[in-house]
Amino acid sequence: MSDSKEDIRNGQEEDDLFSENEDNHTSQQDELINGHIENDSETAVSDDGLFSNTEEATEAPEADVPVKKVLEVAVPNFKSPASASNDVFHAHIPNFLSVEQTPYDPEQYAAEAEADAALLEHDAHWGQRIKHKVDNTVRWRLGPSGSYQSNAQIVQWSDGSYSLRIGNDIYDTQNKLISQPTFVTASHEAQHLLRVQTSFKSSFTFLPSAINTATRSKLPSMRLTTVQVPSRSVQEIIIEKDPELLKRQAEKYEEERSRARRRLEKRKQLNNYQNGTGEEEEDYSSFYGPRSTYSEQNEIIDSDRMDRLKRIKQEGAGQYRGYNKDLEENEEDDLGDFIAEEEEEEEQEEEQEEDEEDEEEVGAGSDIKGFDADKEASVARATINKYEDDEVIPSAVETDRSETVTETSVGDGSVQRRVKRRIVESDSE
């Protein structure tokens, strides 16, 4: 039967909540104590029925076994939660059911009803909680004869299945045997003892009944007892630029930086190679020479490596942590200057190559003209001698230009050509 606060106010709640006819059916109305519905007890077996008279006659009499007293204490005799003729079940209470652990008191129930009515005037949602508290709460009390009475019952059907009835609502149950030994004990804290009263054989799990539409309609209100997990709201982010475009630009910028850094490293290696301090010009004969020379070269190489590693670490720390912004700006300036220098050097190399090509063309032509120039020079000298012998003075100054080509060898084995121009003059006296 269901609970009702109006029945309490009219003084009729006891007849509706706990029926007087339930006293005759104690085997089906044993209540839940301390949060669990327990209806089980071990069958008491008397010592007189352990052995028959024939067994006593055939077996030899046992010798007296000495009994040693270990401890003697006086403890209160707590009543077992279930009678010896019933079974005790362990129940898992779901979130849509609740159990009142204290005995039912009409006066206290009426006071709680008045407090709930006052809260209902300020909060309309409080009515759902009141309805859940009234309809889905297991209560118990002590009857006039001292037996336990409850508004909840475990019903066993003809097919062996079980159901839980609370008032007018029916709930399905799932029965499962307990594999591990589980016992109900009474605690005596003063004597530091635990007294075993009974054991559990099976456990129950309660579910809403599929045939009870009224119960199914109450499920939304039943969920109010669950813990509400706070959900995170959706975060809104305003994007002014295309993130994919920014990503591509950043990747392109990193590629340019890496390319410029590699070119700078190659330039440094080339300078070291030209200055004789690079690893490419390492003199392998130093392995067989004095130890001091080998140590000095190793120190130079190690110091260069340490400086390079230190610089790389500083660049990486400034790039990923953002602590060395000034270092990155200086590095960008150095990279920009280096790129400009590289472009100027490339232009100078191109101009030098063009000049060399022009000189080669001029040198090829001057080889042919050299012989004619020598011939003309000899003719001019002969003419001057003739004029001196004949004492004939020319009236004009004759000037002749001749070009000769000289070849000089360079240390690297290449031949460098130079064009020399010679002017032959004759003056009149």
Curated annotation (Swiss-Prot):
It comes from the Eukaryota. Disulfide bonds: none annotated. GO terms for biological process: heterochromatin boundary formation; heterochromatin organization; positive regulation of transcription elongation by RNA polymerase II; transcription elongation by RNA polymerase II. It is found in: Nucleus. Keywords: Nucleus. Coiled coil: none annotated. The keyword Nucleus applies. Signal peptide: none annotated. GO terms for molecular function: RNA binding; RNA polymerase II C-terminal domain phosphoserine binding. Pfam families: Leo1. GO terms for cellular component: Cdc73/Paf1 complex; nucleus. Residues 328-362 have a biased composition (Acidic residues). Its main location: nucleus. Residues 1-63, 257-306, 320-429 are annotated as: Disordered. InterPro entries: Leo1 (IPR007149). Residues 1-12, 369-378 have a biased composition (Basic and acidic residues). Belongs to the LEO1 family. This is Uncharacterized protein C13E7.08c. It comes from Schizosaccharomyces pombe (strain 972 / ATCC 24843) (Fission yeast).
